[in-house]
Design a protein with these regions (language model features):
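Basic/aromatic recognition patch in beta-strand/loop cores that engages polyanionic ligands
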Residues: 50-81
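Residue-identity detector for threonine
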Residues: 20-23, 60, 78, 95
């Protein structure tokens, strides 16, 4: 299985990484990026990870997986994990996870 990032998820990651570098420094950026990348690889290896949570109330088929202070919002298709958003834990998921977040180019 493989994964794809939506344009919104890609923008989320850029924002997270820029904030981390500015606020916490390059060393923390490298650590956090590795944690997020490891989480994505774990999701790809087992999309129904016990630590993931089904959130059909947000959008049918959506799961959330927590990484430190962020949640990866994704859904599983036949041969691909679609990552729609990477959201800060304090965000209002109901307004951030929508069909628009899962548009892939």
């Amino acid at each position: 299985m493989r994964y794809v990032l939506s344009p919104q998820a890609d923008a989320d990651l850029v924002s997270i990484y820029e904030y981390t570098i500015t606020t916490w420094g390059v060393d923390q950026f490298h650590l956090y990026r590795q944690q997020i990348e490891s989480a994505i690889q774990a999701i790809v290896a087992n999309p129904l990870l016990p630590r993931s949570k089904e959130r059909n109330d947000l959008l049918t088929g959506i799961r959330l997986f927590r990484v430190e202070h962020h949640y990866i919002a994704y859904r599983v298709r036949t041969d691909v994990v679609e990552i729609g958003r990477v959201l800060q834990e304090s965000m209002h998921f109901e307004t951030q996870v929508s069909d628009d977040a899962f548009q892939f180019q």
